[in-house]
């Protein structure tokens, strides 16, 4: 937990950070400082609530300082190679593996072709389709790490008397997913066709560009937070059933079907359901059409 908090404090998306502590908890601010290490005192402020008379007023003063500091920033264009994008699905349906997840996979391939980085997680959702990822590992070391990634989660389940293949959920089944393998084949679609260039432990930061696999469970909040901890600037979240969930970084909701996109337009940012209607994949992931190129 302390390592995770420190990772979020250092996350590049945060222009300013106010770290709040009570004062007598186990993970108090002095303890947390050992995990934070070096930091910019203009960007990170600390407030221990028991030390001040009015913590809300004190917090507002510190937030004003942080806002003034962030106000000195200027937007600048960056190369696509600097981007780190997390990929996650939740509330999947029968179209997730046909529309939304392949769309994210095509985007992942496009970003990687420009030198960028993507991260795929939710390891239990890979069970049954893991060999597709193993066969794309760039070398033997990564292959062995991927095998361990899968087996470690399976061993965790069995050691705690949990059923490995309890997926899919009732919502998945109602949406048209019949088996875990069906769901897993959809999950792995988000990885596109690129080689696996990195396998990360939980909270481990990305250090290799390209496609990375991250050790984290299938739970939406935990997995998306894990993506942020590893450095993801944005999470692309596909769904067929719908969810209002968000994470510590901007979370782009991608629907697998047009019905959901129309019914929950306040939840959904992009409708991938058009892929089975009238929109080619090339346009779906942002490539210019013939008319646009002219």
Which residues make up each language-model segment?
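Metallocofactor- and cofactor-centric catalytic cores in central/energy metabolism, strongly enriched
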Residues: 1-234, 241-293
């Amino acid at each position: 937990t302390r390592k995770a908090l420190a990772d979020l404090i250092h996350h590049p998306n945060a222009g300013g950070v106010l770290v709040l502590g009570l004062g007598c908890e186990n993970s108090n601010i002095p303890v947390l400082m050992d995990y934070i290490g070096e930091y910019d005192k203009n960007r990170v402020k600390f407030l221990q609530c028991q030390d001040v008379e009015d913590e809300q007023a004190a917090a507002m003063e510190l937030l004003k300082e942080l806002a003034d500091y962030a106000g000195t920033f200027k937007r600048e264009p960056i190369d696509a190679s600097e981007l780190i994008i997390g990929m996650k699905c939740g509330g999947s349906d029968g179209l997730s593996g046909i529309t939304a997840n392949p769309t994210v996979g095509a985007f992942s391939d496009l970003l990687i072709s420009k030198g960028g980085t993507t991260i795929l997680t939710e390891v239990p959702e890979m069970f049954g389709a893991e060999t597709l990822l193993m066969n794309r590992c760039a070398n033997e070391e990564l292959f062995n790490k991927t095998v361990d990634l899968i087996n470690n989660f399976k061993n965790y389940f069995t050691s705690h008397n949990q059923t490995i293949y309890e997926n899919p959920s009732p919502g998945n089944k109602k949406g048209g997913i019949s088996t875990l393998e069906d769901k897993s084949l959809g999950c792995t679609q988000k990885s596109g066709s690129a080689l696996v260039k990195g396998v990360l432990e939980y909270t481990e930061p990305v250090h290799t560009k390209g496609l990375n696999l991250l050790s984290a469970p299938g739970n939406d909040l935990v997995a998306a937070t894990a993506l942020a901890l590893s450095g993801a600037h944005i999470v692309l979240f596909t769904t067929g059933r719908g969810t209002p969930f968000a994470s510590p970084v901007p979370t782009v909701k991608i629907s697998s079907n047009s019905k959901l996109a129309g019914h929950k337009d306040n939840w959904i940012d992009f409708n991938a359901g058009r892929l089975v209607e009238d929109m080619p994949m090339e346009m779906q992931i942002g490539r210019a059409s013939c008319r646009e190129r002219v």
